[in-house]
Every structure is written in structure tokens, then in C-alpha cells.
Amino acid sequence: MTITNQQLFERSRQYIPGGVNSPVRAFKSVGGTPIFFQRGQGACFWDVEGKSYIDYVGSWGPLILGHAHPDVVRAVQDAASRGTSFGAPTAAELEIAELLCRLLPSLELVRLVSSGTEAGMSAIRLARGYTGRNRIIKFEGCYHGHDDALLVKAGSGALTFGHPSSAGVPAETAGNTLVLNYNDVAGVEATFSKLGSEIAAVIVEPVAGNMNLIKATPQFLETLRTLCTKHSSLLILDEVMTGFRVGLECAQGLYGIRPDLTILGKVIGGGLPMAAFGGRRDVMECLAPLGPVYQAGTLSGNPVAVAAGLETLRQVQTPGFFDKLSMMTRKLTDGLTSVAIKNGVVFSAQAVGGMFGIYFRKTPPVSFTEIMESDRDAFNRFFHTMLKEGIYFAPSAFEAGFVSAAHGDVEIDKTLEAADRVFSQKA
């Protein structure tokens, strides 16, 4: 007898808080029962009931080559056969560090860690240690992991110190974080004018992916760079999502912005737990064992994760890789927009490299406020009706989507045909 998603979810809730190991997986935003997956191949995966889906989540971004890419699988198997962890230096971790520094000119030194959260919290600690300052700036709607200093929501005004957005975060910790509006140049200028000498760092997603997909304006990023330089604050680009997803030089290459520190994750681990942070040599040399800022990790530079990451990074360097990926992603977003217009549905979409955003509003948003004004009920209906069609989008109106190199014309065309049927029902 085939076990069902509902049965597994009910069992999971007995042993795992909420039945999931990361909140968005619970389908709380869209309602219904989470899907339990058992295998994936290419652009598709299959649930425990045997139903297949075209996947536009891609493990939330890491699977840029698709599921179970044969070369990545072989690399993982080969590495695991020699040992799953050593807790000591390896030649492979040096190789991936050299590769990252070669691909991203802003990286002079890099430190491997196991998650984007770990990379973010380490970069913040490093910035504070380097500058001797405590205040940091983040932007409403940007997510940088679940570190206490970054789980902060905006106060009542642009210069109000932040308040915790999670129970368990001390108010005094949140109080050192200033939360400003994304793409608000005037707000950033006013904050630096008042508090510039106290600001250790600005951390920002150059393309935000956790308030759906919102692009930074060039002027916004250029202003951050100029003000950080002027006030001797550090600019930290969070490229956990965008790193080697929007282009070979990441978002910093697209925008022509050189950060002081960069956070990487997702793609660089090839689907296994790995992340990194790196940047200016003088800043990175403040890390132990060279400097006074402590950071460590038992599984940092894990050889199996490094093997998956190395093979993935080799693949994305193939000439034309990102041109094709961008073309397929734009085919999806342009096609969805066309069938929505055809059926009289208020809808918009946009893409950057292999990332995309879909919105039930007339134009793509440029701020947290605008994405909050989108029609979430319409998105939820769209999500569930597309799910019945075998198309798996992110189960939240506030998450970006992802296309992989395994997505081709067949998968995109099937998706657009399904969307046409769904939109004809006025999703």
C-alpha cells in the first residue's frame, strides 16, 4: 500500500516541530499538505505517492544543474568513498578556495562554512571586530539567515532601531541593527549622515529573493558603496542566492559593485551543506588563527560537500551556460506574462539569470511595501492549481523561483500550457 503525503505529514508532526525542518516547507503560507519527495532527476522530482512535478524551487536555489546531475553524483560518490569528514585541511578545500577567488575578484581570502546563516553571522562578527563598531544596517524584506542580529524588523521610523522579529532574540541585540527600506537612497543617506561613525557594516542582497524577487537599483547599490567607503564601514553583499546563479561573476559582476565582504552559499555546495564568506585581505586576516575574531566549524570544508561544489562550479563555467540559463528563465517569465494577459489576469514577472519572480500585481515590485500589496490569495490559488497540473512553484508568494540547466523547451512549454489552463479559470 502506497503511503501518502498526508500520512507522512501527520507522523512528522509527532517528532519534528510543525512536521518540517524549515518553516516554509510546512505550506503554512499557501495552505494544504506539504509534499514529501523521494527522488529527483533533471528538472523533475517525484513524491512518495509516485506523482511527478516540474521543479521550480531547486532545493531553494542550489540545484543549478538540476536534480542528481550524473557528474555531481559521481564526484560525491568518489569523495565519500575516501572518507566523509576529516576535520583537517584537504587539497580539495584549497582548490575550491582558489577557484572562488579566481572567479570573484573581490575575494582575496575566503573561509568555508556549512550554511548561509553561518556565513552571514560570521561576516557580521568580522565586520564588528574589524571596525570596532556595533551598529549594522539591513533592509526590510532581505533575509540573511537566522542569526539573532539579523532577525530584526523595522521600527516605527526610518532611523528607529530594530525590534526582534522572532521570540528569543534579545532586544539589546536587535537594537544594534538598523532596518531601512530596500532601494531607498534617501533613507540610507539620512542614516549615514546621523550615525555613520557608528556603523560597522551594511548587509544587502543585490537581488532580494525572500520578498519574492526584487532587484536593487544601480543607484541604490552605488550609494551604499560610496557611503560605506566615506564612513569606513564595510559593504557586505549577501550572494547566497545570487552567487553563480545570476552569472559567473555573480550579482556584483552584473552591477559592477566591489563589496568589502561577500557571502556565498547554495550553488557553491552543489546541493550539499556548504557556504563561504570572503573579501578584502586586511579584513579577512582579522579571523582566527591570524587575528582576534573567532570563527570555527567542525564540518567546515567537508570533503563531500566540496566535491559537489567543485563539480558544480566546473559545469557553470562552460561557455554559454548562463546565456542559455537566462534564455530559458526569460522564456518562462515572458510566457507566463503572456498567458496571464491573454486570460485577463493581473500578473507580472521578471528574471535575473536563473532566478525569477512572479507577482499577482500589474508591475514587478521594487520594495517590500509593494510586494506586500500583491494579491496573495490569487497566488495561493495559482500555486495549488499548478500543483495539480504537476508544476511545483515555491509554496509562498514571498519566495523567488529557480530554473536549472536541466530545464529545456519541453519543461517550459508544459508549464506554460498548464498556466494557460489555470489562468483561464481566473486564478
From Swiss-Prot:
Name the enzyme's class. Answer: isomerase
Question: Which pathway does UniProt place it in?
Answer: Porphyrin-containing compound metabolism; protoporphyrin-IX biosynthesis; 5-aminolevulinate from L-glutamyl-tRNA(Glu): step 2/2
**Molecular-function GO term, any one:** pyridoxal phosphate binding
Q: What is the predominant subcellular site recorded for this chain?
A: cytoplasm
Task: Give the sites modified to N6-(pyridoxal phosphate)lysine.
Answer: K266
A GO term from the CC aspect: cytoplasm
Q: Does the keyword Cytoplasm apply?
A: yes
Q: Which GO terms describe its biological process?
A: protoporphyrinogen IX biosynthetic process
NCBIfam families attached here?
hemL, PRK00062.1
PANTHER family according to UniProt: GLUTAMATE-1-SEMIALDEHYDE 2,1-AMINOMUTASE, GLUTAMATE-1-SEMIALDEHYDE 2,1-AMINOMUTASE 1, CHLOROPLASTIC-RELATED
Q: How does it assemble?
A: Homodimer.
**Similarity field:** Belongs to the class-III pyridoxal-phosphate-dependent aminotransferase family. HemL subfamily.
| Protein name per Swiss-Prot or TrEMBL | Glutamate-1-semialdehyde 2,1-aminomutase
Q: Which organism is it from?
A: Nitrosomonas eutropha (strain DSM 101675 / C91 / Nm57)
